[in-house]
Amino acid sequence: YGVSKAATDKMTADMAEELEPHGVAVICLYPGLVRTESVMRAAEFLDLSNSESPQFIGRAVAALASDPEVIKRTGTVCVAAALAKEYGFADIDGKQPVPLSIKDV
C-alpha cells in the first residue's frame, strides 16, 4: 500500500513538472475513510465518526477546479479534509471530517 502511494506521489511531482509550463495543474488528492459499499459492510468493526461520503472527494475536486490559483498547488499532495477547512465546504451530512496525519493512523 505504501509503495503504491509513494509511486502516485512521485508520478504527481513528475507530471506537474512536465505540464506546469502548459498551465496544467497536477495534484494528488487523498481522501480519508470513504463510506463505500465495502466499508459499510464492515461498519460494525470500524469507527466511522470521521469518515467521508463518496461525494466529499468530489467537493474537493470542485473546489480545486474553481480555484483560479490552483496552479500554485501543482505537484503537491492534498488531503480532502484539509481542503474542506481551507475552502469552507462540508460533507453531504454537514460534517467536516478532521484531517488526519500519519500519527493519527
Task: State where each predicted segment sits.
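Hydrophobic alpha-helix immediately C-terminal to the catalytic Tyr-X-X-X-Lys motif of short-chain
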Residues: 7, 11-15, 19, 29
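Active-site helix of classical SDR
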Residues: 4
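Catalytic tyrosine of NAD(P)H-dependent dehydrogenase/reductases that use a Tyr as the general acid/base
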Residues: 1
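Conserved cofactor-binding/catalytic machinery of classical short-chain dehydrogenase/reductase
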Residues: 7-10, 35, 53-56, 60
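Active-site-adjacent segment of SDR/Rossmann-fold oxidoreductases
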Residues: 14-24, 68-71
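Short beta-loop-alpha junction of Rossmann-like oxidoreductase domains
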Residues: 24, 30-43
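C-terminal helical subdomain
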Residues: 28, 47-105
